[in-house]
Amino acid sequence: MPQLEFAWWIVNFSLIWASVLIVISLLLNSFPPNSAGQSSSSLTLNKTTTNWQWL
């Protein structure tokens, strides 16, 4: 029955692409865009220096 195989191919194709698009949209929405006027507090780096003492 080629019609049934083609129907399952269409179903699997649509399910795979729907899941791929959902995963991509979730990944893109999980990272909020940083606007130019807003500084992200999670990406701040505390720069410190160390004074080495030579023996």
Swiss-Prot record:
Q: Does the keyword Transport apply?
A: yes
Q: Name one GO molecular function term.
A: proton transmembrane transporter activity
Q: Which residues cross the membrane?
A: 8-28
Q: Identify one Pfam family in the record.
A: ATP-synt_8
- Any one GO cellular component localisation term in the record: proton-transporting ATP synthase complex
Q: How does it sit in the membrane?
A: Single-pass membrane protein
* GO BP annotation list: proton motive force-driven ATP synthesis
The Swiss-Prot or TrEMBL record describes its family as follows: Belongs to the ATPase protein 8 family.
The protein's name is ATP synthase protein 8
Task: Look up and give the organism this protein is from.
Answer: Strongylocentrotus purpuratus (Purple sea urchin)
